[in-house]
Regions:
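Conserved phosphate-coupling serine/threonine residues in phosphotransfer and NTP-handling enzymes
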Residues: 4-6
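Asp-based, Mg2+/Mn2+-dependent phosphohydrolase catalytic module
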Residues: 8, 12-114
Length: 114
């Protein structure tokens, strides 16, 4: 599941460019900014994704690279928040409420262990 604040046209561009249909159904698995929900840090987009997945929020793992997204996931009750440190230092992101740990890339071994 992808929950993004990006607009549909941007999502569609990346969906095609990176051939994401290998892993995600565009209509079922991707929730994007469509004007019906407040933007992050409001938890609405993550709550919608969690409802769509059908599990409890505490069972959800979120990968997020922005502080507003981390705040959104935390407010939605995500059980595990993995901060992806693209521009910020991992140590700074790990100090944010709800962050389990921060990674610099998806080869981090902690992802496989949890």
């Amino acid at each position: 599941m992808i929950a993004t604040s990006a607009e549909a046209r941007n999502v569609d561009f990346y969906y095609r460019r990176f051939v994401l249909d290998r892993w995600f159904d565009r209509e079922k698995d991707i929730i994007c900014a469509d004007g019906t929900m407040p933007s992050k840090p409001h938890p609405a987009i993550y709550k919608k994704a969690m409802e769509r997945l059908g599990g409890e929020p505490a069972q959800c793992r979120v990968y997020e690279d922005l502080t507003t997204g981390i705040a959104s996931a935390y407010a939605a009750g995500a059980g595990e928040i993995i901060a992806v440190a693209s521009a910020a230092l991992p140590e700074k992101l790990e100090q944010l409420p709800g962050v389990t740990y921060a990674i610099s890339d998806f080869t981090d071994e902690r992802i496989r262990k949890s």
